[in-house]
Amino acid sequence: MKAKAWRLYGARDARLEDVELESAGDDGVVVELVTNTICLSDYKGVSLGTGHKRVPKDIATRPTMFGHEVSGIVREVGEKWKGQFQVGQRVGLQPSLNIPGHELETVGYAWHTIGGETTHVYLPSIVREMGCLLPYDGDAFFKCSLAEPISCIVSGFRTNYHNAFCSHDLEVGIVDKGTMLLMAGCGAMGLGCIDIACHSPEKRPRRLVVTDIDDARLARAAKMFGMAYAGGRADGEVNGVEVHFVNTKGMSDPVKELKAYNLVDDARADNPTSTGGGYDDIFLFAAIPALITQCSDLLGFGGCLNFFAGPTDQHLMANFNFYNVHYLMHHVVANSGGDVKDMADSVDWIGKGYLHPEVMITHVGGLDSAFEATLDMLKIPGGKRLVYTHVNMPMTAIEDFAEKGKADPFFAELDRICSANKGLWCKEAEDYLLANAPRVEIGEPKELVRERRITTAAR
């Protein structure tokens, strides 16, 4: 199977090349990708190259593919898997294969025929053996790509835990009908977290408070969930969850003001031995020491802080109130990615329409723009970047479609479609793009790329 793929040769050195992939053979699967969404972890891997723990040391001579938030269509199925997958079936992929002895060798870093920024991938048998190729029954490919970042949030909701006073029995997950705070929560992952908090078929809070320090981000987030932002805040209800968006930038005492949201119904508000107004569950989306300390002060009795932000500083330190750890049962957790169940549930919930991951997307482009868009992650503000792997298209902000549409009817039509959908990407926009954008042409392959073989028998 011929493919055009971005391949990583070193730090900030990726090349768009035509290659030949293996056929499915007896036990492989070949998938034609349709979409990939770019993750901040892609930026870390591409920027660091072999300096990243997950990237092999020999990529200069044996390059890997990058990108891991994918969706596509099965094109070839080996005899071993014909009872489980069929040609033409839509699928997603769990990138954390979790192969014993090879735990750090995840999709998007360590594999030569599996990545996101490519037209096709070859999946060796181990991918299916680990349960990481997942059927998808949704209506749009881009939603399946977003199942991977959504699964990280689902994992976060399941990583939090609580226990009753004087009890060793732990209740895993957020507090059902509790109070939740998202600090710096209007980025792409924060928006996904809001969606899950309001629409998850599992536990949901009764009250959700979302902070940021940028009015534009807050206004966009509020609009996506049907609220009008003005005067530094927006208040409303989403699917039975009380939701508040608030700008903390000008607050003289953010801890006091954020606790005020809970004082209306906090049974511990007048208890001098407790922290009245504190939150049951806090998710922090920025690795900033001052915010970590604020979160410490904002936890309620038995509260759980999920340090969701992945830091780059290996020596990150912050003040944390350990008096309250001892007496008020405060605790901290973190998670990096989800497992197969988190991913399978995310794919299922998106396919059934429970979740609306389109709120995360701010930019759309083609395969030709994928590498530059990855390198520009920290330079250009916005949420998720969506790549259609079989088209050529500059990475473009949805909010810029109208301006580009003045000279290009292609963007004018995309603007019309998205404007009719609250400014969000949607299935109609995807269908139009796939039918009208310039197609990627795959040339003569420079080499046949074979994947290394890892078997479960070697565990």
Q: Where do the PLM segments sit?
A:
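Glycine-rich beta-strand-centered segment in the early N-terminal region that forms part
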Residues: 22-37, 50-100, 114-115
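NAD(P)H dinucleotide-binding glycine-rich loop of Rossmann-like/cofactor-binding domains
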Residues: 57, 95-178
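Glycine-rich Rossmann-fold phosphate-binding loop(s) that bind the pyrophosphate
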Residues: 77, 149, 184-187
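Residue-level detector of alpha-helix initiation sites
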Residues: 140, 151, 187-189, 289-290
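C-terminal hydrophobic helical "lid"/dimerization subdomain
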Residues: 164, 252-255, 264-271, 277, ...
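Adenosine-nucleotide cofactor-binding segment
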Residues: 177-178, 183-186, 194, 198-291
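Glycine-centered, small-residue-biased loops immediately flanking beta-strands
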Residues: 206, 303-304
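Rossmann-fold NAD(P)-binding glycine/threonine-rich loop
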Residues: 290-293, 297, 309-329
